[in-house]
Swiss-Prot record:
Residues where ATP binds: 99-106
Organism: Mus musculus
Bias type Basic and acidic residues, positions: 1249-1259, 1370-1379
Domain of life: Eukaryota
Pfam families: DEAD, ERCC4, FANCM-MHF_bd, Helicase_C
Biological process annotations from GO: interstrand cross-link repair; positive regulation of protein monoubiquitination; replication fork processing; resolution of meiotic recombination intermediates
Phosphoserine modification, residue list: 30, 1637
Domain Helicase ATP-binding as annotated: residue spans: 86-254
Name this protein carries in UniProt: Fanconi anemia group M protein homolog
Keyword Hydrolase included in the entry's annotation: yes
PROSITE patterns: HELICASE_ATP_BIND_1 (PS51192), HELICASE_CTER (PS51194)
Post-translational modification: Phosphorylated; hyperphosphorylated in response to genotoxic stress.
Length: 2021
């Protein structure tokens, strides 16, 4: 052989010899030869490398030839021939080993595992056992048998974390685990499947059906077949069929079967005597059986007569036979049985099955078990109502049941503890003769065992096991044996709890019982089938089977518990009859199995493909060797030992030293002086017993003993006031705090007099932090003077938590404490309009309203100064313990105080019924009440005049937790039908972003008391917030004697001051007169007599007027109960509507008259945010027809101009993003700021619209009067008043009734509402100042998107980032009044005709029926600008299309979209189109999706908004067809809403400027040319999904250019090949969500996956048929493939404008579209960009399938996925860039084949992650949800599914639902799929919401669809390219990112990988977030705003168990951090 032919090793080996030979020739090498040497060496290296690779050929699988020459058999255990033979056989073939229990199956497994462990050094050896104890036992056995190092072995069960398991798989070689863990790890990809070389399956007879064993083998085979399987079982199966199934599932190629009779087994098996004892039933049991058979005949005969049950002997029928008959009846129902008869037969079947189960119990277990079963039916615990009713009517049954009840009812109360106590007094009743026989056998056994008093027997106490199938029988046996203690020490052994009423054993308890039984604690164990297999229960001498098992497996398993080490005995106790026959049949089956396996091999088909695993040339030889092993250490012990550091503090765990780390000298000193010895008389230490005064002392008093040293906390106090020396570990901060406290205590101990500590900290005292509470007694004395005596005393706003929701408030001031006197209170009941069940409070508790009777007519009180203090006691806990039953309502108990002619002070006890409000209320007010009588102000209840503190306002900024709860009450209120709309007028929505609050707690601005203009609360420092205002209580109210009459009460006079928390308000005389009924209520406050000095009159508050139902927290009497709407529950108060009859409400110098009840002034107003330093108006008259507002306002107030802004923080704070469910009239406020032409219109008494006569309403004086206060402008930094408030022509109210409740939700309660009783004055949405930090930063206001209903537009300016709400195209006359603040709000009311084409809206007539409020009707006027319509959006699931721009802007504000970009400040509505066109297309490109349409497609379309389409970007770069569609859309008549329904083309991509501008080359495609086929749009349902997307036509020049670069050429070529001329098709506008249809131009010939939505798709019609073809070919005809229209429809995105609104939070209300609309226009569903716009609106699924019945293919839901031709290997796979799909961990159990196919068949990278509701994430923007057809059919899971869709829409741009056909069970006949109404409506709703629907025939096809979706997303550069596995540092940030609302898992992953830290992310701009997180700009702005939202720690709730915020609600970072912690 030449050197060139030798290998490297051959060349190197003999080179020395060869070299010497050659040198002997004496021929020197030539230079050429020398030069060739390097080349020869390279070739040799190549050959050597080839041989090395060949040796590592996968065919050998890493087999080590050196180790493979031998196989080791241990001799440290006795060698048994059968074990040796079976081991040799199992090494070379997949083997099933069947050995009786106790004969060494585990030993054989250990031998085989060890040899494969040697042969394959890099392979894995896996042992699987069904239970954890078996896993542990096998691991220990392998160590003892073969000595496998423990460091190479690992045990993995479900308790092992998945991350740890993946590490174990990579580091360990021999693994012991349960099959479920193996399945999970295979699915996760954690198992190196190709490295598994040996798989051992214990208890292999379980490998049936879809058990985890079968799944493991199926998964492994997908990776490799090169592994050995060893199956172990005592019995291969219950019959031949089961054995064959095991062989097939486990790939068994050989069976090694040994029975107890086998010759090679006999020498090693101990004798097992099997005794069969047959017991007759007996007379008593026989009689009961006879009676029971009669009962069975009664019910079974009915089925027999109907020919649905076979005619057989009734006693011989079995439960199984009846079940089979029922299944047969269901499959083939008789044609004569229809309708209700079928249900009756089903009920009879169920009843017979239950009765026959009881019959079996009677025969096998006895009467007691039967009684327990029947009692479960009769007492209703089993929920079988029909069976109970039927049985109750049967006389024989009731007699039998009564008899059993008398015998066993007392025993039924006995439990296991009673058994263990051995209740011997009670006589045991033997319910079955078998029990007596069992007792005899056991007693005989122990008697005979104890008689053998040999030494050997004494060492081994006998143990007995009793098996019974039912727990009731187990308990009965244990109770019987307890009578024979202590001879029989019995314990039960059952499995886990199987239901609510059963208590089982946990695994820990099971192991404890087994251990005690094995160790001798018990000698008798009564067990269910749990003890049959697996557990090592030690040697058992006697096995008793109390019942027979039909399966021989269970019988053999039971017998295997004995006869292992010594002789065993098995006793089977059988009842005569059926049980005996069952046992005999079982034994026969066992013999047949052994005979079939061992005798006739042809019966079973064995697996022929078992790999040899050993190379052919190698034949391992047996090598017996003695194996030694060390001591086995349990896993837990080793894990503890390996832990180098302790879990706390990182201190190294080390053994403690006796010297305690003391030096020798120190130790000796301690030992000599301090060590306690016996002489010290201290033998132990004890803690002193604690004493709880509230608990009874039941403990036993122990005698004190001197030997016990009682520890004391104060004993070492002298040592605890200084830090002691430390060693290595320093003192903690907690320790230092403790030391300082102890030092302070020690210092204070010796003080006398005034406390030095108090003096020291008094300068730092924050009064709002001081908490106190006061329980005012009923009819008792309130010592207010004593309460108000200390310095700087303010009101406390801390509610008592234990008060059940009631609050106590007393306000007083230091300066006027001398005027406060004790008064006797008489309580008056003023109840809320409607009482409701308490939501968060104590259930079932009611509040008794004390009805006091006022005796005095004079409501005034006078003191020395002629001033009257007002007190408001919101009693926290009434002495009688009453609780309010109505949530959100306030029960106001007015106390008319009488003393010294001062009966005018009204004490209002306002009991907040919302307990959660009281619980969450925070104390941010003053409370210097140091004594226990200190009272807490109710920071919830708008007690108008009683709360005098100027600090009250700021306290409302701390009530966010309470408002959240109350807002939840509002949500409940909304579940009722809405009020009518006819008379309601729009809410003027005031929004500002310019307000700056310097103080989060909203100081009371005392220094501005005399300021000529109002001052922003934020303008005061924290120091100022500590100042006190002059007490209003020093002033007196002059109360004319007025009485009010409430139904059911006597006339009381109530004096009240209409101020809640404004100390600077003037006293107003308010007169309430309820003339709508016979009762009258007059509350008068003196406007002129102020409570403060006259020089502080600038601080006066305007009088209280009353808002409508949306603002006022009013409490009406019973006369208001005719109002249909209950009060809104807001901020703990009740918001009732008003009566239809209104009386004048006068606000003058003396009186303010209203028809409202006396408590109607309990309002939430904007006073919390405002400082009203203006004069009150002299007179404002609210007449029956008009408001009279006389100018009496000082000139100084004319200067006080501010932009009245309202803040809605409900979007940011709360999850209350729902709607009232109706639109409110916008027309009623047409003249809100109109000119004099509208002045003559007056407001009727019943008109709630808020329209006022201009000539009667003069200048409101800077909103100081009720009109101005109604708008309640929020002070901006310029502190100016609203222009409309100063419009002398028209100072109108802002009516809240036109807006949904969600818009009017306040984050804070508002104080003094100023509005007329029927005038719906606008209740401000005040933003908690605590939500905004101090500093010059303005409010980051998040507009509620539902503002769109108001018809306002919002314009933002770059300079000030302010929001303008426009409703009028004309500037008002007061525009010049505004200051430099640009937050001008202009509102103009308009009326729009209703135009809901799908649903008849409520008209004015209907509304009048619904509501007692009758509005003055106005002639309808056509809209001239965007505004909302009352009637338009009656569909709760719609957003108003005319307000889409507003919502878009609103959304941009709310989500932090690009407000900083240059925008034109639009001043008028007339120019909105131009401004918006430039603004949206230019600056908002980043935040508006390319395919987004800012309108709800399912909305009425008659608005003039559609005439001027300003919601598109088409002015920048559009194609012609788009322009045509826009034009056709714009020319629709505003009055004929459906005259033209134009098809909307796909709008340009978001990155429009990166695309080539499109050319206008073809006039035919000009936007002004309408295709002639457009007229046919609505005529052909066949064409509905034939949407022309062929943009490669030459007329589309730019599209042609763009698409030809990718796929267009191929498309054209395909069309040319098939000689197909494409006809002109309708260009239905199917919007691809942020997608480009060019990406899907690739239409393969071989595969088409279609998706059908709606009816056509699901029914597989030809329009939207599901072509579910596998990779082999396409089921679509070639002509269909060549049809461009089909091509286009295949590319459509199933996108319909998502009708995602917030009317009903829990339902997807997708309004069903009309036939014409769906056909004529695929509505521009926007993908997620537009869905994000509605992100916080729950989708409404209210699809009516009947409306869709005529639109078979209507929903345009066909989405056809295309695979490129020849996609055998995807492009990315060829390029090495595999597509990645994230799969939810829950899919491991339900979608195992999907995951496996994705990974093995399609080669995708699959990562298992906890996706929290997302089944599959295929890209950064698309999520796929997999649902089975059965899940879609059922109505039970519909709501859950809807909620899931809602949540996903807030996180993903695209959602796809795969509806998968249910898997058919083996042997079941295929059932015809029957659609249900729920199924159709759900599909329709999904389509309407823009969700793509795909249909799949199975999991394999689902995987194929997922792959195609992933490839499409990959081509769009949206694929997942980041690893799903995070390192430890990044893993810590993941939970925080996931806590951000609306963030998906993939987005969080992107943020983890792209941002090095959370800090970097928090400091990133929205643009950076958008880039790194791969989200659109809007989502990035949302994240940015969430992170940067200013948070006040005082906003944290007391109780963290609040309802979670919805994902789209802007939470604060502090709340997120709190959740993380």
């Amino acid at each position: 052989m030449s050197g060139r032919q030798r290998t490297l090793f051959q060349t190197w080996g003999p080179s020395l010899v060869r070299g010497s030979g050659d040198s002997g020739c004496g021929q020197p090498r030539s230079p050429a030869m020398a030069e060739a040497l390097p080349e020869e060496d390279d070739e040799v290296l190549l050959v050597a490398a080839y041989e090395a690779e060949r040796q590592l050929d996968p065919g050998d699988g890493g087999f080590c030839a050196a180790a493979g020459a031998l196989w080791i058999y241990p001799t440290n255990c006795p060698v048994r021939d059968y074990q040796l033979d079976i081991s040799r056989s199992a090494l070379f073939c997949n083997t099933l080993v069947c050995l009786p229990t106790g004969l060494g199956k585990t030993f054989i497994a250990a031998v085989v595992m060890y040899n494969f462990y040697r042969w394959f050094p890099s392979g894995k050896v896996v042992f699987m056992a069904p239970t954890k104890p078996l896993v542990t036992q096998q691991m220990e056995a392998c160590f003892h048998v073969m000595g496998i190092p423990q460091s190479h072995m690992a045990e993995m069960t479900g308790s092992t974390q998945a991350v740890n398991r993946k590490e174990i798989w990579s580091s360990r070689r021999v693994l012991f685990l349960t099959p479920q863990v193996m399945v999970n790890d295979l699915t996760r990809g954690a198992v190196p499947a190709t490295h598994v070389k040996c798989l051992v399956v214990d208890e292999a007879h379980k490998a049936l059906g879809n058990y985890a064993y079968c799944q493991v083998v199926r998964e492994l085979v997908k990776y490799t077949t090169h592994f050995r399987i060893l199956a172990l079982s005592a019995t291969p199966g219950s019959d031949i069929k089961a054995v064959q199934q095991v062989i097939t599932n486990l790939l068994i190629g050989k069976i090694e079967l040994r029975s107890e009779e086998s010759p090679d087994i006999l020498p090693y098996s101990h004798e097992r005597r099997v005794e069969k004892l047959v017991v007759p039933l007996g007379e008593e049991l026989g009689a009961i059986q006879k009676t029971y058979i009669q009962i069975l005949e009664t019910f079974a005969s009915s089925l027999i007569h109907r020919n649905v049950l076979m005619k057989r002997d009734i006693p011989n029928l079995t439960k199984y036979q009846i079940i089979l008959a029922r299944d047969q009846f269901r499959k083939n129902p008789s044609p004569n049985i229809v309708g209700i008869q079928q249900g009756i037969i089903e009920g009879e079947f169920a009843l017979c099955i239950s009765l026959y189960h009881g019959y079996e119990l009677l025969q096998q277990m006895g009467m007691r078990s039967l009684y327990f079963f029947l009692s479960g039916i009769m007492d209703g615990t089993k929920g079988m109502t029909r069976a109970r009713n039927e049985l109750s009517r049967n006389e024989d049954f009731m007699k039998l049941y009564t008899h059993l009840q008398s015998a066993f009812a007392p025993a039924s109360t006995s439990d296991a503890s009673a058994f263990q106590r051995g209740n011997k007094e009670k006589k045991f009743v033997y319910s079955h003769p078998k029990l007596k026989k069992l007792e005899e056998v056991i007693l005989e056994h122990f008697k005979s065992w104890n008689a053998k008093a040999t030494t050997e027997k004494k060492c081994h106490e006998s143990r007995v096991m009793i098996f019974s199938s039912f727990r009731d029988s187990v308990e009965e046996i244990a109770e019987m044996l307890l009578q024979h203690r202590p001879v029989i020490r019995v314990m039960t052994f059952v499995g886990h709890a199987s239901g609510k009423n059963t208590k089982g054993f946990t695994q820990k308890e099971q192991l404890q019982v087994v251990r005690q039984f094995r160790d001798g604690g018990y000698n008798t164990l009564v067990s269910t089938c749990v003890g049959e297999e697996g557990l090592d229960i030690g040697e058992v001498d006697l096995i008793i089977c109390f019942d027979a098992q039909k399966s021989p497996i269970r019988l053999i398993q039971r017998m295997g518990r004995t006869g292992r080490k010594r002789q065993g005995r098995i006793v089977v106790i059988l009842a005569e009859g059926r049980e005996e026959r069952t046992y005999n049949q079982s034994q026969s089956n066992k013999k047949n199995i052994y005979k079939a396996i061992s005798g006739n091999r042809q019966v079973l088909r064995l697996y022929q493909g078992s790999p040899r695993m050993v190379p052919d040339k190698i034949n391992p030889e047996l090598h017996k060797m003695y194996i030694t092993h060390g001591v086995y250490e349990p896993e837990k012990a080793r894990s503890v030992q390996r832990r180098p550091f302790s879990s706390r503090g990182g201190i190294k765990a080390s053994k403690s030293n006796k010297d305690g780390l003391l030096s020798e000298e120190e130790f000796n000193l301690w030992s000599r002086l301090y060590r306690l010895g016996d002489s010290d008389q201290v033998k132990g230490v004890a803690l002193p017993q604690s004493h709880f005064p509230s608990l009874q002392e039941d403990r036993v008093i122990q005698d004190p003993t001197t030997r016990i040293h009682q520890l004391s906390l104060s004993e070492w106090s002298l040592w605890q006031d200084r830090p002691l020396p430390t060693h290595q570990v320093d003192h903690s901060d907690r320790c230092h705090h403790f030391i300082s406290i102890m030092k302070m205590i020690e210092g204070m101990r010796h003080e006398e007099g005034e406390c030095s500590y108090e003096l020291k900290i008094r300068p730092f005292l924050q009064m709002e932090d001081v908490c106190s509470k006061y329980h005012a007694p009923r009819n008792g004395y309130n010592n207010v003077a004593s309460v108000a005596s200390s310095a700087h005393q303010k009101s406390s706003f801390r509610p008592s938590v234990d008060a059940g929701g009631s609050l106590t408030v007393i306000e007083s001031e230091e300066e006027h404490a001398d005027t406060v006197k004790q008064r006797d209170s008489k309580w008056t009941k003023i109840t809320s309009l409607r009482e409701k069940p308490c939501r968060a409070g104590r259930k079932g508790q009611t509040c008794e309203h004390s009805e006091g009777e006022g005796e005095d007519g004079d409501a005034g009180s006078s003191d020395a100064d002629g001033q009257s203090p007002a007190e408001a006691d919101s009693q926290v806990d009434p002495p009688s313990g009453e609780r309010m039953a109505d949530v959100g309502g306030i029960s106001i108990l007015g106390a008319v105080t009488e003393e010294d002619n001062h009966p005018g002070t009204l004490q209002m006890e306002c009991q907040v019924t919302n307990k959660s409000c009281a619980r969450y209320s925070l104390d941010s007010g003053y409370s210097s009440f140091s004594d226990e009588k200190s009272v807490s102000s109710n920071l919830f209840l708008p007690l108008e005049e009683e709360l005098f503190t100027d600090r009250a306002a700021e306290q409302f900024y701390n009530c966010r937790p309470m408002t959240e709860d109350v807002l939840a009450n509002v949500e409940r209120f909304l579940s009722r039908s809405p009020p009518s709309l006819s008379g309601l007028s729009d809410l003027v929505y005031d929004v500002t972003q310019g307000c700056e609050f310097d103080n989060a707690s909203c100081s009371p601005y005392p220094e501005h008391e005399h300021s000529p203009r109002p001052v922003s609360p934020a303008s005061h420092s924290a120091g100022n917030s500590q100042q006190n205002l002059e007490s209003n209580s020093a002033k007196r109210i002059s109360h004319p004697t007025e009485k009010y009459c409430l139904p059911g009460t006597t006339h009381n006079k109530v004096s009240d001051r209409p101020s809640f928390c404004e100390s600077d308000s003037e006293g107003h005389n308010i007169k309430y007169q309820n003339s709508g009924s016979n009762s009258c209520a007059q509350i008068q406050a003196d406007l002129e007599n102020n409570f403060v000095d006259k020089n502080s009159h600038d601080d006066s508050e305007p009088p209280v007027l009353f808002t409508d139902e949306d603002e006022s927290l009013l409490l009406f009497e019973d006369d208001f109960k005719n109002i249909e709407d209950g009060p809104e529950e807001l901020n703990g108060a009740s918001l009732p509507p008003f009566n239809s009859i209104s009386q004048p409400l006068r606000v003058s110098g003396k009186t303010l008259t209203s028809e409202m009840p006396p408590v109607s002034h309990f309002l939430i107003s904007d006073e919390l945010l405002l400082d009203d330093d203006s004069e009150p108006e002299d007179q404002i008259v609210c007449g029956a027809k008009s408001w009279k507002c006389q100018e009496g306002v000082e000139d100084g107030q004319e200067e006080l101009r501010t932009d009245g802004q309202t803040f809605d923080c409900s979007v940011d704070l709360f999850s209350v993003t729902f709607d009232l469910g109706f639109r409110c009239s916008s027309g009623s406020d047409d003249e809100m700021l109109a000119g004099a032409s509208d002045r003559t219109r007056t407001l009727g008494a019943a008109d709630v619209s808020g329209r006022h006569s201009d000539k009667e309403i003069k200048d409101a004086g800077g909103a100081s009067g009720p009109l101005g206060r109604a708008i309640s402008p929020i002070p901006t930094e310029t502190a100016q008043w609203s222009p409309w408030a100063q419009n002398k022509e028209y100072a109108s109210f802002h009516v809240a009734s036109s807006s949904p409740v969600k818009q009017r939700v306040r984050s804070t309660p508002l104080s003094k509402s100023h509005a007329s009783s029927k005038t719906g004055a606008h209740m401000l949405k005040t933003l908690d100042s605590t939500k905004e930090k101090a500093g010059g930063q303005g409010f980051k206001m998040a507009l509620n998107p539902r503002l769109g209903h108001l018809g306002f537009s919002v314009e933002e300016t770059k300079s000030s980032d302010q929001v303008f709400v426009h409703q009028s195209p004309r500037r008002t006359e007061v525009e010049h009044l505004t200051s430099e603040s640009e937050d001008d709000v202009f509102l103009r009311k308009t009326k729009k005709p209703k135009r809901n084409v799908l649903k008849s809206p409520e008209d004015q007539k209907n509304n009048e029926v619904d509501s007692p409020i009758h509005a003055v009707k106005k002639p309808r006027v056509l809209r001239s600008e965007l505004a909302s319509s009352d009637d338009e959006s009656e569909n709760f699931g719609r957003t108003c299309p005319r307000l889409e721009h507003f919502k878009g802007r609103n959304r941009n504000i709310r989500k932090g979209s690009a407000a900083q970009k240059n925008r034109s400040q639009v001043k008028t509505m007339a120019r909105r189109f131009l401004d918006d066109e430039a603004e949206v297309s230019g600056e908002d490109v980043d935040c508006v999706s390319a395919d987004e349409e800012d309108e709800s497609e399912n909305e009425q379309d008659s608005s003039l908004l559609d005439f001027v389409n300003d919601r598109t970007q088409l002015s920048q770069a559009i194609n012609d067809s788009e322009m045509r569609a826009i034009y056709m859309k714009s020319v629709r008549s505003p009055l004929m809403s459906t005259k033209y329904r134009m098809v909307r083309e796909k709008r340009p991509n978001m990155n429009i400027f990166s695309q080539i501008p499109e050319q206008d080359e073809n006039y035919l495609e000009d936007s002004f040319c309408v295709d002639e086929e457009e007229s046919c749009k609505s005529q052909s349902s066949e064409e509905e999904i034939s949407v022309d997307f062929n943009l490669t036509k030459d007329s589309f020049t730019d599209e042609d250019i763009r698409y030809k670069t990718r796929y267009a050429v191929k498309i054209k070529q395909m069309n040319k090949k098939q000689n197909y001329t494409r006809p002109r098709k309708k260009l239905s506008r199917i919007i691809l969500p942020d997608d480009d249809s060019s990406e899907e131009e690739n239409i393969p010939k071989d595969r088409e996956h279609s998706v059908a939505g709606g009816h056509a798709a699901a029914e597989h019609t030809q329009q939207g048929q599901l072509w579910a073809s596998g990779p082999s070919g396409s089921s679509v005809p070639p002509q269909v493939l060549s049809d461009p229209s089909w091509n286009q429809s295949s590319r459509q995105r199933l996108q319909v404008q998502p009708s995602i609104t917030d009317a009903v939070p829990r339902t997807l209300n997708v309004k069903a579209q009309s036939h014409n609309k769906i056909k004529s226009a695929s509505p521009p569903c926007t993908g997620v960009e537009s869905r994000k716009e509605y992100g916080n609106h729950p989708v409404q699924l209210k699809a009516d399938s009947q409306e869709h019945s005529d639109t078979s293919a209507a929903p345009c839901s066909t989405s056809l996925l295309h695979v490129a031709e020849g996609h055998t290997a995807p492009r990315h796979l060829q390029e090495g860039n595999r597509a990645c799909i994230l799969v939810d961990s829950r899919e491991i159990t339900t979608g195992l084949e999907v995951i496996s196919s994705l990974r093995t068949v399609h080669g995708l990278q699959v990562e298992i992650c906890p996706l929290n509701g997302c089944d599959y994430i295929v890209s950064s923007r698309m999520v796929v949800v997999r649902r089975s057809q059965s899940e879609m059919l059922s109505n039970t899971s519909k709501n859950k599914f809807i909620e899931q869709m809602q949540r996903l829409q807030s996180m993903f741009q695209r959602i796809c639902v795969i509806v998968e056909k249910d898997r058919e069970k083996a042997g079941d006949t295929s059932k015809k799929f029957r659609r249900t109404k729920c199924y159709d409506s759900l599909l329709t709703a999904l389509v309407g919401a823009g969700i793509r629907i795909l249909f799949s025939s199975g999991q394999e096809e689902t995987a194929d669809l997922l792959k195609e979706l992933s490839l499409v997303e990959q081509r769009k550069n949206a694929g997942i390219h980041i690893p799903a596995v995070l390192n430890t540092s990044k893993l810590e940030a993941l939970p925080f990112y996931l806590s951000i609302p609306g963030i998906s898992y993939i987005t969080a992953l992107n943020m983890c990988h792209q941002f090095s830290s959370v800090k970097k992310m928090a400091n990133s701009s929205p643009e950076e977030i958008s880039t790194c997180a791969q989200v659109n700009h809007q989502k990035a702005e949302e994240i940015y705003k969430y992170i940067h939202y200013i948070f006040d720690m005082q906003m944290l709730p007391n109780d963290l168990n609040q309802e979670r915020q919805k994902p789209d609600t802007c939470l604060t970072l502090g709340v997120a951090m709190k959740e993380l912690s």
